[in-house]
Amino acid sequence: MALPPSGETQSQDKANYLPQSNPHHLTTYYAHAPGYSHFRNLATTEEEFQPWKLAAAVLESQAMAPLDAFRMTAPLLNPGLAVQSEPLYNLPWYKLSPWNRIPQFTPEVPRFLDSTEHRSSGSSNQNLVLGGGGGQISGQRWEAENLLLPSPVIASLLPDGIKSSQSISVPQTLNQEGKLPFCGFNFTEEELSFVLYGAIASPEHPTDLQHAISGILVPTESSGSNHLHKTLDKDSLQLPEGLCLMQTSFGDVPHFGVFCSDFIAKGVRFGPFRGRVVNASEVKAHRDNSRMWEIFEDGHLSHFIDGKGSGNWMSYVNCARFPKEQNLLAVQHQGQIFYESCRDIQRNQELLVWYGNGYEKFLGVPMNLRVTEQGGQQLSESSEESAEGYRCERCGKVFTYKYYRDKHLKYTPCVDKGDRKFPCSLCQRSFEKRDRLRIHILHVHERHRPYLCSTCGKSFSQSSSLNKHMRVHSGDRPYQCVYCTKKFTASSILRTHIRQHSGEKPFKCKHCGKAFASHAAHDSHVRRSHKDNGRSSCDICGKGFLDQEAFYAHMRLHKTC
């Protein structure tokens, strides 16, 4: 939402113009609109995918729907948009807290050429009915707090007038229900396709053209397939079996897309999306975010993955324009982006990705913000839990990550009140299942380690632990970092390594405040620097030890369980 900085007032004498009804004027009009990255502090309560929406009401100093208005869902991940923009605020959007108060505004009816001024003084909670001509979607409801608004457009860059065939109905007043009447726009399907899949001028190289969606440079001398194929090495993309990179076109503009050469069943997952890790502080230096994904942890922005120049085939998968066209879901799992087929994909169909109904569940992104009548924000229950950490209901201990809270609940007696079916006769623990009791006795009390390494003689309580250990001798490292060439024997080691790229340091010393990327580094620091401050304590269950060897044995016990 392009709001003025604090203390500034908007001009009251700017008129809004609609572009002439042809693709070239539409491209000129939309090319100056800001990208999605400047609207991230705008709350949204929309749950369903509805990309074909045109904004029917904007601030009086702003023009009508930019290219971004056709992709109205979550303004968080957008791997297919190449429209570049300039900063609208002195403070970058990524430094704004997602819980910041959202500036309130009064939606107004736009003023058009040769038309009188029309204003509405309703509250920001008014419902707007939107629609469009040609391939219009009618009957869709749009809340004012969901509205994405473009920045002011320079009048000299717009067409001189409006064709007589473009009849625009500007409502005079609100109806009895306090809502704006229907407002129509005559955009043809061909014009919309040109805007979404046509060519726009590259801001970095004005003589070159870029695809509006993929961001791939379009050859200016020839639009033939032979010339276009020379700009990309398909063999370097390492496409999975059953997929191929093909050229398609909308009108005369060539365009790359990923197609399936064989049938793909529902539920097949591709990935991960490979690229360079970019910290939030570096984003302002990246003018083109067309292939950049945002990674969230516990509902907060962690880092970005930039697929530009990585030779990643997933960066050539285009965005779906409407629900029936979508066949891939973008999901986040363990800090990585995957594409998962949400329906059966027939042979020769193009892969088209967008977000699904499980967007919040997959990404952990706080999407359930609600704007209160006083203008403040009300958090959902899950957002409140993420904001203050994850608390154990039995003992009150707070954990930074849900993973460690769950570990705490699983392995500590604080959650056990002796009311479970299978109590342990050797201690005060009890279990809901008999097999968990058996494993507890073997591992904790009998120190039973039947799985012996034939190479070094080390023993383990579980076969899975032995299998992990054998990788040390065989040299097998199946877990590879997506950001560099390093490989690891265990997924836990890989997770710790990735924090070197992201800069995340979740383990903070309670004595001096110094942060660390791993438990081991944190514990080593405490033992070396704060030995006199007390005895060593387990971060998982809270048990304390004066003897370091006993502490090490206890920590190994958690790893084997």
Swiss-Prot record:
UniProt-annotated binding residues for S-adenosyl-L-methionine: Y355
Pfam family, one: zf-C2H2
GO cellular component: nucleoplasm; nucleus
Cell compartment(s), UniProt: Nucleus
Region described as Disordered: spans on this chain: 1-20
Organ and tissue specificity: Restricted to embryonic stem cells and primordial germ cells. Not detected in epiblast-derived stem cells.
Comp. bias (Polar residues): 7-20
Entry keyword Transferase: yes
GO molecular function, one term: RNA polymerase II transcription regulatory region sequence-specific DNA binding
Protein's name in the database: PR domain zinc finger protein 14
Species name: Mus musculus (Mouse)
Originating gene: Prdm14
